[in-house]
């Protein structure tokens, strides 16, 4: 049985303190400071090259960085098992020979011993997760046989079996069908209801109000952070996007 609900009374919080990242001497993220309290679905919004994906990678230690991040008061790099991460699809090899159920089962490995075989109860969790995302009949297929939206749902199912307290998603809705997007958002909303804290790098401004409780507006620096209602404003968006906002048709 999948475990989703966090401990009652516990406050889940990400603290980002002076986080900076440079690539080949070029500053990509400049002293980001923000505290995100869960449960929530928070959108990370900004123009191309604003440092959105870099922020996630810096938090996870995937790229070299300055500053620090805390998870519930502890160094985030010591709490990685509590975080599920789905990177951009462009970085994933669709042709890798692995079945859907095996791909989902990878979410279980942070919690099992090296070379330990999965138990029947573990495969039950995999099947339950696939059912939640509407892919229970696809378990034996190769991932190369899936559409982009179906594969993204597989990655969400992998997050489900990981049973993490925090979920970081980098552009999960790019290039997927509307049915898959709806299923993923329904799943994420249930996870938030169950106490999870979710960060999503996102670019489609038309969906921001419908999808996010909070938004972090970013353009190499934190421009604004807060509830979507109070933060996703014309003034803040112009400050974040500048002329790009009008080139893209407005917010």
Curated annotation (Swiss-Prot):
- Signal peptide interval: none
Keyword DNA-binding recorded? no
Please list the residue ranges annotated as the ABC transporter domain: 14-245
UniProt entry tagged with the keyword Signal: no
Chain positions recorded as ATP binding sites? 46-53
GO MF annotations, alphabetized? ABC-type manganese transporter activity; ATP binding; ATP hydrolysis activity
Q: Which topology term describes how it sits in the membrane?
A: Peripheral membrane protein
- Give the UniProt subcellular location, in the record's own words: Cell membrane
Please give the Pfam families that the UniProt record associates with this protein: ABC_tran (PF00005)
Any single GO CC term annotated in Swiss-Prot or TrEMBL for this entry: plasma membrane
For this UniProt entry, which segments traverse the membrane? Answer: none
The record, for PROSITE patterns, names: ABC_TRANSPORTER_1 (PS00211), ABC_TRANSPORTER_2 (PS50893)
Write down the EC number: 7.2.2.5
The consequence of inactivating this gene is: Inactivation of the gene results in both impaired growth and strong inhibition of Mn(2+) uptake.
* Catalyzed chemical reaction(s): Mn(2+)(out) + ATP + H2O = Mn(2+)(in) + ADP + phosphate + H(+)
Task: Name the keywords, alphabetized.
Answer: ATP-binding, Cell membrane, Manganese, Membrane, Nucleotide-binding, Translocase, Transport
Fetch the InterPro entries from UniProt: AAA+_ATPase, ABC_transporter-like_ATP-bd, ABC_transporter-like_CS, Metal_Ion_Import_ABC, P-loop_NTPase
Similarity section: Belongs to the ABC transporter superfamily.
Q: How does it assemble?
A: The complex is composed of two ATP-binding proteins (ScaC), two transmembrane proteins (ScaB) and a solute-binding protein (ScaA).
Known function = Part of the high-affinity ABC transporter complex ScaABC involved in manganese import. Probably responsible for energy coupling to the transport system. Essential for growth under Mn(2+)-limiting conditions.
Record-given protein name: Manganese import ATP-binding protein ScaC
Organism, scientific name: Streptococcus gordonii
Name the encoding gene, please. scaC
């Amino acid at each position: 049985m999948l475990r989703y609900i966090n401990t009652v009374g516990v406050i889940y919080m990400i603290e980002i303190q002076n986080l900076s990242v440079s690539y080949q001497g070029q500053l990509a993220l400049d002293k980001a400071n923000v505290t995100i309290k869960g449960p929530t679905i928070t959108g990370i919004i900004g123009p191309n090259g604003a440092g959105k994906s870099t922020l996630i990678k810096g938090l996870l230690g995937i790229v070299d960085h300055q500053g620090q991040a805390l998870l519930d008061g502890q160094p985030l790099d010591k709490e990685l098992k509590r975080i599920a991460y789905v990177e951009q699809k462009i970085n994933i090899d669709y042709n890798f020979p692995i079945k859907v159920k095996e791909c989902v089962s990878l979410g279980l490995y942070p919690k099992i011993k090296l070379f330990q075989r999965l138990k029947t109860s573990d495969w039950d969790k995999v099947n339950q997760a696939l059912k939640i995302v509407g892919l229970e009949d696809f378990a034996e297929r190769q991932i190369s046989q899936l559409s982009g939206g179906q594969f993204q749902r597989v990655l969400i199912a992998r997050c489900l079996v990981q049973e993490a307290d925090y979920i970081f998603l980098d552009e999960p809705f790019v290039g997927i069908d509307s049915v898959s997007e709806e299923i993923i958002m329904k799943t994420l909303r249930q996870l938030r209801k169950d106490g999870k804290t979710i960060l999503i790098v996102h670019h489609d401004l038309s969906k921001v109000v419908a999808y996010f409780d909070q938004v972090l507006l970013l353009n190499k620096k934190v421009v604004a952070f807060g509830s979507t209602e109070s933060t996703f404003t014309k003034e803040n968006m112009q400050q974040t996007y500048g002329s790009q906002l009008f080139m893209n048709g407005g917010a």
